[in-house]
Design a protein with these regions (language model features):
Chain A
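Positively charged n-region of N-terminal signal peptides that target proteins for export
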Residues: 1-4
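Bacterial N-terminal signal peptides
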Residues: 7-15
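N-terminal leader/targeting pre-sequences
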Residues: 20-184
Length: 184, 184
């Protein structure tokens, strides 16, 4: 009986560990600051499964522009970065992170394009992705929603200023405000 | 105790009703027939929640083109169609359905764009959407995945043949092969 009880507790603990999620808000920018969004209801929820080394992320937009594609990405703050993050390719200069300046802040980054939030007639949409297994490490990152879809991916619009610009960032409010994600 | 058992049974039955899902395969076309896809592992899973009148659809692509955007949509076979399907726009704006000829078959359709499957370095990707509440009725429809993203949505590629064409249809294999979905 004691053994069964211990097993149940262990199972419960592992479920809790795998599903402990962090929720964070979007903020405006880092390129566009007038794109509509309900900042109270919009959010990003992410969690790490330490057993599978997988990162789950759900992007939720509420009250954005109706019937629009927002490509969602992670920007890693780094000096060098591997060619992939989980099953997604990274955008670097042969492994070296690329220096960009936004909101007067200059930092070296590697970008990973994860997918697209498509909004409905109310400007609402969600997109969920499971990334991994991810190489163990501590990652300093910022989530971004671009003003369109196509950068670094086949079949979308051109990766020009109109489509690539950051409409929303998280955490923010300034480029370089970061979230730390640890993959054990 | 008997009352508790009955309540539990009712709860279980309602959960079962809401989550009964249909799985169907993709087939090639109806425009492009050379786009790579593991037709055995790729699928669409859909279910109707009769209580909320919501339709849940998951599009899964396996071994498609890596790092590509596939916009997923529904073609309804109809004579007239409302301006919206749940919270998504009818591309034709509502009213009379529009004749479309593919694979030698001509049918009147209304199209609704639901979102985007983004593939990873292996050509795998999935996208889930919950549509509704949907007007009660019986819908004859075919799912399809376009060769890019942007048709009838802001922020993607232009809706030219390169991006609008259907790479995959379901059920198929011929345009007009339909799935019937009933919203009570």
């Amino acid at each position: 009986m004691k053994r069964i009880f211990l097993m149940v507790v262990a199972l419960l603990l592992s479920v809790i560990a795998a599903s402990a999620a962090t929720t964070q808000k979007w903020t405006a920018g880092w390129d566009n600051f007038s794109e509509p969004l309900n900042y109270n209801k919009s959010k990003i929820t992410w969690s790490v499964n330490p057993t599978t080394s997988k990162l789950s992320v759900t992007f939720k937009l509420v009250g954005a522009t109706p019937s629009k594609l927002y490509q969602v990405t992670i920007h890693f703050f780094c000096t060098t970065f591997p060619p992939t993050f989980g099953q997604f390719p990274t955008e670097t200069n042969n492994g070296a992170c690329v220096t960009i300046t936004r909101q007067g802040v200059t930092a070296s980054v590697a970008a990973v394009e994860l997918g697209v939030v498509t909004t409905d007639i109310n400007g609402n949409g969600t997109f969920a992705v499971v990334v991994g297994p991810v190489a163990s490490g501590t990652y300093t990152i910022e989530f971004v929603a671009r003003n369109g879809a196509g950068c670094g991916l086949v079949g979308g619009g051109p990766c020009d200023t109109n489509h690539a610009a950051g409409d929303f960032q998280s955490p923010g409010p300034t480029f370089g405000d970061t979230t730390t994600i640890t993959i054990p | 105790m008997k009352k508790i058992m009955l309540v539990a049974a009712v709860l279980l039955m309602s959960a079962g009703a809401a989550s009964a899902a249909t799985t169907q395969k993709w087939t090639a076309g109806w425009d492009n027939f050379g786009e790579p896809l593991n037709l055995t592992k790729s699928k669409i899973i859909w279910s109707v929640d009769p209580t909320t009148k919501k339709l849940s659809v998951t599009f899964k692509l396996v071994s498609a083109t890596p790092s590509k955007l596939y916009q997923v949509a529904i073609n309804f076979f109809c004579s007239t169609f409302p301006p919206t399907f749940g919270q998504f726009l009818n591309d034709q704006g509502g009213g009379a359905c529009v004749p479309l000829t593919r694979q030698g078959v001509t049918l009147d359709v209304a199209e609704v764009e639901l979102g985007v499957v983004t593939t990873d370095i292996h050509g795998n990707g999935s996208f889930t959407v919950v549509i509704g509440p949907v007007l009660s009725g019986t819908y004859q429809l075919e799912f399809f995945a376009r060769n890019g993203a942007g048709c009838d949505l802001i922020g993607g590629a232009s809706c030219d043949p390169d991006h609008a064409e259907a790479d995959f249809q379901s059920p198929g294999p011929t345009f007009g092969d339909a799935t019937m979905i009933t919203i009570p």
